[in-house]
Amino acid sequence: MASVEYLIKQFLTPDKKNLDLSNQNIGDKGAVQLSTSKNLRKLKKLILPNNNISDEGIAAIANSENFKNLTDLDIYGNVISDDGVKVIAKSPHMKNLKKLSLYGNLVEDEGAIAIAESQTLSKLKHLFITSNRIRREGIESLQKAKCRTRLCHLHVDDMKDFYYEEVTDEDDEDLINSWEEIKARAEKDGDLED
């Protein structure tokens, strides 16, 4: 991996508002270095997919005053869990976020609820949070938040995946519950050999 300062020089746009470090495998160490870089104070868009960043790295970024102007944070395909998402949801430096992509991380219900209940993320309009570990409670919290906030574009896994049909007793007629039932059915059908 090249040094983070070298990557910043290579990929920071001339106006210093966009930085795309996709697939650079910077990890937490690189994320911490980003959080202290003086070259990123004007940054509006930070793109960090597939960089092996965990909660430690995203906490450094979310808590860095360097990112107070950030409107777009793309951190899909990392290893960020609920703890990292909670830091984003509470950090005063993330208050200008309009777009957050957490696609393909390790976020569960707790992280989704933290985003849904966040007072800090009041400007968030686009949330991409599919392919995580969020279940019904988290999805429902986000959908309720969408109704009462500016969150216009919510991309979550389909709720149909979490609804299960209840099996009734009538559906149990053909179920076999013991070896004795197997033998009895085999005898009835003439399939049992002596």
What are these regions (language model features)?
Residues 1-43:
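N-terminal segments that cap or nucleate solenoid repeat domains
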Residues 2-4, 24-32, 52-59, 79-86, ...:
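Short, solvent-exposed loop/turn at the beta-strand->alpha-helix junction
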Residues 6, 16, 125-126, 133-194:
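C-terminal capping region of solenoid repeat domains
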Residues 14, 38-41, 65-68, 92-95, ...:
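Inter-repeat linker/turn residues at the boundaries of leucine-rich repeats
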Residues 17-21, 43-48, 70-75, 97-102, ...:
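Conserved hydrophobic beta-strand positions in leucine-rich repeat
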Residues 31, 36, 40, 49, ...:
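Short, contiguous, helix-prone interaction/anchoring segments in small proteins
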Residues 49, 56-66, 72-93, 101:
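Alpha-helical adaptor scaffolds
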Residues 86-145:
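Ankyrin-repeat and related helical/solenoid repeat scaffolds used for protein-protein interactions
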